[in-house]
């Protein structure tokens, strides 16, 4: 009795391996970028949420008559500079006197369910964003009274996943700024209300 052999011949096996290799060579690079795409989408989402929240603060300020130094947003008092009407924290009312802490107050008070954040000089492990103010980097803007205000501060929110974190201290090294290589994040200008996402890939 003769048995008929079932299965792949050597040539068929080689062809299948070559085809699988070609598929892997084209698919793997796409899957390697999934993490970076997710990080970029996360930053864009936070940026959009912050821009919307800043717009809500400005709208409430307009409804309240444009001269109040604060508005109530969802039960939270949010301070603002009456020359512009955009949030400046919970107690600060000057766009040229922002601090790391007031930038953090803006982020945490206007966003509903704000991402976990910490000042850039603190342990960033188990956080999502670091917060930093860059003094005078926001440029100038014209207030509602027509006066030009210069040296407006800029709030910068860096995505921690894009930073190098010291394993011992948990602090981002070097201190993140707008030029930190590989960094991703969001900027907020309290003089213009402009919110932008950035990536330094």
Language-model segments: which ranges?
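N-terminal single-pass transmembrane signal-anchor helix
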Residues: 2-42, 46-49
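Membrane-proximal N-terminal amphipathic helix
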Residues: 38-66
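Intrinsically disordered, low-complexity regions enriched in Pro/Ser/Thr/Gly and acidic residues
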Residues: 76-201
């Amino acid at each position: 009795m003769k048995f008929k052999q079932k299965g792949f011949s050597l040539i068929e096996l080689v062809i299948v391996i070559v085809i699988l290799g070609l598929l892997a060579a084209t698919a793997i690079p796409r899957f390697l970028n999934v993490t970076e795409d997710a990080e970029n989408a996360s930053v864009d989402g936070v940026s959009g949420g912050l821009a919307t929240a800043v717009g809500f603060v400005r709208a409430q300020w307009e409804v309240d008559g444009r001269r109040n130094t604060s508005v109530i947003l969802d039960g939270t008092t949010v301070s603002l500079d009456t020359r512009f009407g955009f949030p400046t924290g919970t107690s600060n009312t000057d766009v040229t006197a922002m601090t790391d802490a007031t930038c953090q107050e803006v982020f945490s008070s206007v966003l509903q369910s704000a991402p976990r954040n910490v000042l850039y000089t603190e342990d960033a492990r188990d956080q999502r964003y670091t917060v930093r103010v860059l003094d005078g980097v926001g440029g100038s803007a014209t207030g509602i009274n027509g006066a030009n205000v210069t040296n407006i501060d800029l709030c910068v929110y860096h995505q921690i996943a894009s930073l190098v974190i010291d394993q011992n201290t948990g602090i981002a090294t070097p201190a993140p700024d707008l030029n930190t290589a590989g960094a991703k994040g969001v900027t907020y200008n309290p003089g213009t209300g402009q919110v932008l996402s950035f990536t330094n890939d």
